[in-house]
Amino acid sequence: IKMIIEFAKEKNIAIMADEVYQDNIYIKQDFVSFAKVLNNLEINDVTLFSYHSVSKGYLGECGHRSGYVEYRNIPDDVINQLLKMQAVGLCSNHPGQIVIYLLVNPPKEGDESFPLFIEERDGILSSLKKKAKILSNGLNSIEGITCNPIIGAMYAFPNITIPQGKNDFDYCMKLLVETGICIVPGSGFGQKEGTHHFRTTILPPEEKLREVVEKIKVFHGNYGN
């Protein structure tokens, strides 16, 4: 993060920090925001946009289409343009505003709902952590697939070895047709030339994830034959 901030300062470019997975950490490591590092470095001339959303994290309320952006060190003319963009909306997203309020103002210790909030939040994060291990271990058990440990967020990005002349888009499409499993080709994420990957998620239930791994195992063994 420090290197990115220093690079942005040198090149006079803004930083757009997508920090929606700050609660989804499955190892003993604290989340560190760009804003915190920026403050620690006492740098006040690097523009920073920090994003959060109710669609991600442990809430996963995608349908509400609600989030927020915190900005720092923004020139006045940019603020004016942002206000113009905000003003063109015909009406406010009332349900989304309610949900984003709950995100930034969760129950506090002493509140009647606090114990239930902690129980539900920790239960969701514990389940995601378990499913992250199920998926990464399962994919690594398949010959020709290697997957880094999933230490945060909700996704895996395994490397796949496929026959010469094949590509990850073809792999993903055939997997969808033959098994009903939908994954995303790694070529859409700027993967290194000459390598092949796909992206998938840890969101399905635990037993469903095990079933997904078994289907991918059979498919991968037969792919290209």
Regions found by a protein language model. Give the residues of each.
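PLP-dependent class I/II
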Residues: 1-225
